[in-house]
Amino acid sequence: MAKKDGAIEIEGTVIESLPNAMFRVELDNGHKVLAHISGKMRMHYIRILPDDRVVVELSPYDLTRGRIVYRYK
C-alpha cells in the first residue's frame, strides 16, 4: 500500500453501496464519508459489499470524501 503524503488513513465500515463504485462509509469515530475504490483495487477486481471493514484514505482538504485503499478479509 503506497502511503500518500499528507493523507489521513482511518478504518471504517461500509454502510451502503452507491452508483459509480461509490460507497458510504461510517468511520470508527462516527463520521460518515463518501468514498470511491482506489485504482489498484479496481484492477484486481476486489469487490466491496456493505458491512465490510475497510481502510479509507482522506485528504486533509476535504474530510467528507475519501478513497478506499484496503478491505479486511
Curated annotation (Swiss-Prot):
Signal peptide: none annotated. One of its GO terms (cellular component) is cytosol. Keywords: Cytoplasm, Initiation factor, Protein biosynthesis, RNA-binding, rRNA-binding. InterPro entries: NA-bd_OB-fold, RNA-binding_domain_S1_IF1, S1_domain, TIF_IF1. Its main location: cytoplasm. Residues 1-73 form the S1-like domain. Component of the 30S ribosomal translation pre-initiation complex which assembles on the 30S ribosome in the order IF-2 and IF-3, IF-1 and N-formylmethionyl-tRNA(fMet); mRNA recruitment can occur at any time during PIC assembly. Belongs to the IF-1 family. One of the essential components for the initiation of protein synthesis. Stabilizes the binding of IF-2 and IF-3 on the 30S subunit to which N-formylmethionyl-tRNA(fMet) subsequently binds. Helps modulate mRNA selection, yielding the 30S pre-initiation complex (PIC). Upon addition of the 50S ribosomal subunit IF-1, IF-2 and IF-3 are released leaving the mature 70S translation initiation complex. This is Translation initiation factor IF-1. It comes from Thermobifida fusca (strain YX).
